[in-house]
């Protein structure tokens, strides 16, 4: 099981809202952590990120959701299936979609020509809680996430695999080092899904080394259930923890029991 280092009072933890998970993590994820989520299937791990982000936003954390291969309306529709409506949260600036998808698609439609800008999509194309940005993903991340982080903010990078297939691993590593430093200083969280089948072992090992928390999702293809393996966690003495979960009409449900492996 996971044991905290030092007294509980000295370790600030952020509860995910997933009861069985928070219990096994000693009260939640340590604040100031970059969380790498490794899976061979996209659906469950993205659902996990959306569910925790919505729960944290409902508790007062500001969410910056960086989406690369889906536009914000697509993500909203996914979340609406589970009654996670971000409309009011976006209007209140508690939830912001950073849209790196739409500008790239628009550039492709235009043959890659023309200067992209914040307003290229025209009036009314963006809701108050989403920003459509230029095609350079690193510029987008630096300008509209790193420079905007406040205390306790939560960032979702959907997904880290999409960054890695568009940029060199060394460049992504540098970016994650900077992002990790900012998150540590502001006691926030970053969730980074990684689709294991898209990368070699060296790349996965490199990103795992940079991450504060590493979780591997093992999903049974024939059933909507699986196991989470926690291999690494900062500010905790961690023996790899195996936690069963299932996917229900309420999202990802962690079992109230787990076992040490």
Which residues are covered by each model-predicted region?
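Loop/turn-to-beta-strand initiation segments
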Residues: 62, 93-94, 151-155, 185-193
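Phosphate-binding/switch region of NTP-binding enzymes
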Residues: 188-189, 193-252, 260-261
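N-terminal pre-Walker A segment at the start of P-loop NTPase domains
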Residues: 2-19
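Walker A/P-loop NTP-binding active-site region of P-loop NTPases
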Residues: 24-102
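A generic structural signal for well-ordered alpha-helical segments
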Residues: 56, 79, 183, 207-208
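NTP-binding/hydrolysis catalytic cores, primarily Walker-type P-loop NTPases
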Residues: 15-18, 128-133, 141, 245-261
